[in-house]
Amino acid sequence: MKNYRIESDSFGEIQIEEKFYWGAQTQRSLNNFKISKQKMPKILIHALAILKKCAAQVNYEFGDLEYKIATSIDKAIDRILAGEFEDNFPLVVWQTGSGTQTNMNMNEVIASIANEELTGKKGGKSPVHPNDHVNKGQSSNDSFPTAMHIATVLATKQQLIPALNNLLTYLQDKSKDWDKIIKIGRTHLQDATPLTLKQEFSGYITQIEYALERIEDALKKVYLLAQGGTAVGTGINSKIGFDIKFAEKVAEFTQQPFKTAPNKFESLAAHDALVEFSGTLNTISVSLMKIANDIRLLGSGPRCGLGELHLPENEPGSSIMPGKVNPTQVEALTMVCTQVMGNHVTVTIAGSNGHLELNVFKPVIIYNILQSIELLSDSVNSFVTHCVKGLEPNIERINALRDKSLMLVTVLNPHIGYDNAAKIAKEAYKYGITLKEAAKKLNFLSEEEFDKIVIPEKMIS
């Protein structure tokens, strides 16, 4: 049989199962928003706990929290950060657009843990009050966007950047010995002039290098924190200097260069920094989609495709075709890319709906951004482990396709002119003969002259 205790808020009393630490406002949110099962991301809860810890420290230093209260709050938060109370943050994304209920969930749980330590009984509002003490000098309107920024930075630094660096390392490692492998290039999915396999992969490498640069550029605005703006940006009920000191505390705790936002009205009413950052994630997914699809095409076959790359064989590919193996890691990564692109559309629409002094699409913005970061990080790591590491060139196939390509004729342009070179290509294609044979047949070049000019190794700069 479940045991219950009574908690209260401005709406009155409400029953809460005794084993949980949350209070009345959290319970009301649970009762009122039974919408799907997408909970607030764990890293956002972690960021909100960091926020409360730093706020309590600043309030104590400003003389606004007595030592016993501040210490009990600090200890409670340390336990939350250590993962002791993960089941006490049950609220879904689909709640108030300011994130107020999740902010109060954190306030109530911290106060409840602290009160249990001080009195032996969880819950209640004394001696530690969720609003008067844990939320002191704060509003959900500045706390939740601050947590959004902290969570985005932490997730990016801990997950996405390492994953992209891992991909970059293995692309560089794989291609370093491919500078002597000359293959045919393709534009419009049609044969083009030659290049080396290393040159082809250098494009992918640069895309990932640029992706990492874009992340650092986009994070510059995400480092700016809204805390101190309180309700509408004026800083009501927050002391002068609280915002600066708070940002310094967060920077010290996280070892990230957080600063207070110069204009709190902007940081409450708009989320342009996160829309921009989501745009960076979108661009990264565009890059990854291109890279993955190229590898898929180059590995197509095994007998009737391009077949220039051997892709690792990880599992059976068909329930009806025996022996079939598919590029499943590519497929997983490209599906993730489409999801991230869709997430960016959501973030864009949500970001554009910051009406007057407060954007009230905050939970859906951060949910989609954090999902994009997680999906990209996990899928890139999987792609590296189960695909990129095992890529091998099919030298025989590469050479065969290169040597019968009609576009080697391009190098003849300076010697016999574009129109005559085009005639050679068309003649070779029409009669199924080599370029050399066509050049001789049309009396443009002898075999010896052709061999001196058409050298793939000299066509790659």
From Swiss-Prot:
It catalyses: (S)-malate = fumarate + H2O. Its EC number is 4.2.1.2. One of its GO terms (biological process) is malate metabolic process. One of its GO terms (cellular component) is cytoplasm. Keywords: Cytoplasm, Lyase, Tricarboxylic acid cycle. Pfam families: FumaraseC_C, Lyase_1. The keyword Cell wall biogenesis/degradation does not apply. Substrate binds at residues 98-100, 129-132, 139-141, 187, 319, 324-326. The active site is at H188, S318. The keyword Lyase applies. It is found in: Cytoplasm. It comes from the Bacteria. HAMAP family: FumaraseC. Homotetramer. There are 2 substrate-binding sites: the catalytic A site, and the non-catalytic B site that may play a role in the transfer of substrate or product between the active site and the solvent. Alternatively, the B site may bind allosteric effectors. Involved in the TCA cycle. Catalyzes the stereospecific interconversion of fumarate to L-malate. This is Fumarate hydratase class II.
